[in-house]
Design a protein with these regions (language model features):
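Small-residue (G/A/S/T)-rich helix-start motifs and N-terminal tracts that mark the onset
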Residues: 1-132, 141-159, 164-286
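A short, hydrophobic C-terminal helix/tail in secreted or cell-surface proteins
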Residues: 287-293
Length: 293
């Protein structure tokens, strides 16, 4: 168990070859959104493509009924719509297969809402796909309703990103015990279910039950709606061109925390929003990442 430093993550962001193309850096998908919470999936989408996570192509997968509200936020990204009812996705195997075609990694759950069809979609992906999948927000709520043995059976490399209350729901651990022993319980759960667990907190714990990193980047200004959505976008972008390792996931957490710190310096901890971390420029962020402490 060790605190992650900037020197540890330089290998995650290598210098790119002049002859590389977008396919070299992965097609990634962001699946989420519903009529009530379209903003969450917009944040995840923007962070994956506009921050420094570096995916080659970002595909936003949303319910058909909210597509018009999402389209103005798309510049370089592509859009795939899923048939929906009352603003929520409907489960259809052929549509899901088409939506996930060619993807190197997927983030799911941001602003998704809770429904029987969403649970079916998540279960189908876990049982039938083979890709890194970042599960956040309502994706975690869907997972909490399932038999956790599905995590041991899946061919996906699962990355879970709960805050302590969400971790209580998916693990069954006592909330106070989680607050008192976050590293130990996170490691135990990750090892038992063969996942990478990113447990959010003042000190964020990232572990697969064997290797554990602690990330102490971040600020109080990030304690606001949407910060988790931004993190999920960053993570899936990184996983588009890196192996699904504890270090890769930790690098995403470090990057999100650093972006938050820089945004807080430009604004303040009271008025900053999650979207402000996205507006931190690529050049500014990378300059801080590679400079000395």
């Amino acid at each position: 168990m060790e605190e992650l430093k900037k020197e540890d993550i330089k290998c995650i962001f290598p210098k790119r070859d002049e002859n590389s193309n977008k396919g070299d850096f992965g097609y990634v998908g962001i699946m989420g959104g519903c009529i009530e919470y379209s903003g969450a999936v917009k944040l995840a989408n923007l962070s994956s493509s506009a921050l420094t996570s570096g995916a080659g192509v970002v595909r936003l997968i949303v319910p058909k009924e909210i597509a018009n509200g999402v389209m103005p936020y798309l510049l370089e990204q592509t859009l795939f719509t899923i048939e929906s009812k009352d603003g929520h996705m409907l489960f259809n195997k052929k549509e899901i297969d088409k939506a996930l075609e060619k993807l190197k990694a997927l983030a799911i759950g941001m602003g998704w809402g809770e429904s029987e069809d969403n649970e079916k979609i998540l279960r189908y992906i876990l049982e039938n796909k083979e890709m890194p999948i970042v599960i956040d927000a309502d994706g975690l709520n869907m997972l909490a309703k399932m038999d956790k043995s599905i995590l041991n059976k899946t061919k996906c490399k699962v990355i879970l990103t709960p805050h302590p209350k969400e971790f209580e729901r998916i693990s069954g651990y006592d909330f106070q015990d989680i607050l008192n022993n976050p590293q130990e319980l996170a490691s135990d759960f990750a090892k038992k279910y063969n996942v990478i667990l990113l447990l959010k907190g003042h000190t964020t714990t990232i572990t697969d039950g064997k290797t554990t990193y602690l990330v102490k980047k971040g600020c109080s200004g990030m304690a606001t709606a949407g910060s988790g959505d931004v993190l999920s976008g960053i993570l899936v972008g990184i996983l588009g061109y890196n192996e699904s390792t504890v270090l890769s996931v930790s690098a995403g957490s470090y990057l999100a925390g650093l972006a938050g710190e820089l945004a807080e310096k430009e604004l303040n901890d009271i008025s900053m929003k999650a979207s402000d971390t996205i507006s931190v420029s690529y050049t500014h962020l990378r300059a801080h990442e590679t400079s000395a402490h």
